[in-house]
Amino acid sequence: LFRSQRILLSGLEATMLRRLAKTPGRVVTKEELITLAWGKDGLIHEHELQRQIESLRRKLGDDPAEPRIILTSLSGYVFAAVKEQGL
């Protein structure tokens, strides 16, 4: 549940969200998320990771122009620890 609403996530989205939410406020590297989602031998381009994060943001109602839930850093992504989001 997010903001008291049930949100349907794909398996990849749920895996990424769990990992990001595990360490709020800290960067999770792109490499770590790619390995977690697709395995060490996964030949996944960074663009596919970005696509999955965009989809996850959209489902969470996060504004891609000014994200407040999943932030982008140079090396990866950060889950913002925001109590008002209801997480």
Model-identified regions with their sequence ranges:
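A structural micro-motif at secondary-structure boundaries
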Residues: 2-15, 27, 43, 78-87
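DNA-binding patch around the recognition helix
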Residues: 8, 51-87
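Acidic-residue sensor for enzyme active/binding pockets
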Residues: 13, 46, 54
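Hydrophobic residues on short alpha-helical segments
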Residues: 17-18, 34
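Short coil-to-helix segment of the ABC ATPase nucleotide-binding domain corresponding to the Q-loop/switch region
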Residues: 25-37
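Short, positively charged loop/turn segments that connect secondary-structure elements
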Residues: 39-48
